[in-house]
C-alpha cells in the first residue's frame, strides 16, 4: 500500500516538474503567438492568417504561429489645436 502511494507521489511530482519545464521554455522563446481568430483545417490556412511567421501549424484546429516578425504599427498622431 505504501509503495502505491509513493509511486503516485513520484508520478505527480514528475508531471509537475515537466509542466514547469515546458512553461519556462515557452516563456523563454517569447516568439510564440497563438491565433484565436478562427479555426483551421490545415497548415496552409494558418500561413495565410499569420503573415510574417516562419513556422505555422494547425494544432487541434487552432493556428499556432512561431518565429514571427511582427510589422511595426504605423501610429498617426493627430493634433486637435
Swiss-Prot record:
Keyword terms: Antimicrobial, Disulfide bond, Fungicide, Plant defense, Secreted, Signal
Keyword Ligase in record: no
Entry GO MF terms: mRNA binding
GO biological process, one term: killing of cells of another organism
GO annotations of cellular component type: extracellular region
Disulfide bonds: 40-58, 46-63, 50-65
Signal peptide: 1-26
Domain of life: Eukaryota
Cell compartment(s), UniProt: Secreted
Family, similarity comment: Belongs to the DEFL family.
Name under which the protein is recorded: Defensin-like protein 266
